[in-house]
């Protein structure tokens, strides 16, 4: 019996860092507030092979979704979106892949199981790193929220020696994982050029946004051209012309018409017609009786103005310079000289 036990111990692989122990039994480093994950979600993975078999079945069923997720991950180290499964007291671990590192949640909504054996630090959200060499088998049933932004966990040093990560098998979890990458790709593309978008991303845009983008591009291509004013019809008249025609065609009674040699002029008063006909006949009945003056006039008002020359009578006087004038029109013309220039 003792020899069989020795041979079994020789063939058994070392379990220094790969030993599967509960998280609650791991000693906490100095200054750490403790690992406060509920004990109900921490299990000792003694049936690792059964979970690995279930993981292989899930990978076969969800191979298409996994390939899409792996292609979306960058080749060099970039932080994966930590909003895959927001759990209030969720633990994050730093996983080293190639030359980079990213942060992955240990437990998430819709995840059937996660089995990881590694020698690195565990970081609870808001706490200090725990000790190394821990194997965790976590099942979580916390509801997932759409794209929350928990605080980013600082990167810690360490290298992953051995680990198995089960990809979520539910379609809703896959949708939550792919949506952030789609949002980043949509934001990285210029929204003003809908032609640059791939066909699958153009289907994601709402119809009203596509219409607004097409309208904006059309308005940018076509320059603004001012339309010429519409010409008025030929028969139409301007308002000023129509008012003038109405004034000329006003129904004013002019019964007195001159018949001398088809003159055609008409007047409102008979006296005006008589004085007009004197111009045709040349008769000047109003003669000046001043001594030695032989002037004659057609009208009496003209004779009265003429006599002012002889008498020196000037009835129109300027208020500013006291100058006197025989006629009112002469006074108006004189007042223009006093206006400021």
From Swiss-Prot:
SMART domains: ZnF_C2H2 (SM00355). Belongs to the Sp1 C2H2-type zinc-finger protein family. It is found in: Nucleus. It holds the Pfam family zf-C2H2. This is Krueppel-like factor 17. The keyword Metal-binding applies. Exclusively expressed in testis and ovary. Localized to step 3-8 spermatids in testis and growing oocytes in ovary. GO terms for biological process: gamete generation; negative regulation of transcription by RNA polymerase II; regulation of transcription by RNA polymerase II. Residues 238-252 have a biased composition (Polar residues).
